[in-house]
Amino acid sequence: MEVATFGAGCFWGVEAAFREVDGITSARVGYTGGFLDNPNYRDVCSGRTGHAEAVEVTYDPAVVSYDALLDLFWETHNPTTLNRQGPDVGSQYRSVIFFRNSEEEAAARASKEKLQRSGKHSREIVTEITPASQFWEAEDYHQQYFEKRGVTHCRV
C-alpha cells in the first residue's frame, strides 16, 4: 500500500471523491503543511498555522496509479484560484500536492504542466507541490462528513 496527500479546498468533498475510487483502501481528512503541532479545526481556520485542509489516501498501486489520483485531484477543484475554492477563502483552502519521494514530485510537476498546456484553464495553475510533512487527523466529526449526512458532493 502507498499513501498520497492532497489539499484541494474544503476537505469534505475531496474525501468523498477519493472514497469512490477502486483501489483506495482508506481516506481521512486532516491538516498538514504548517508549523503548529496537533492543530484543531479552529486553529487551522484562524489562518495562522500554515496548515492546509487535506485528504490522506491509502491506495493499492496495483489497482490505481498515482497518476490516476493526480487526475482526480485536478478534477475535484479549481487549481487556478489562490487560497480559495468557491466560497471558502483562506490559505487552509489552497491547492497543494504533498509528495513523499522524487517520483511523486516528478509525476506531480509533469501532471501540473500537462494540465496547464491543455488549455482547460485560461488562468495560471497556482497549485503548490511541496514535500509531505506530519499529517494531523481532523476531528471525528469531519471524517466521512458527507457520507454521514447523506450528501453526495459540494459545489465549487
Name these PLM-found stretches.
Residues M1-V156:
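Flexible coil/turn and secondary-structure edge motifs
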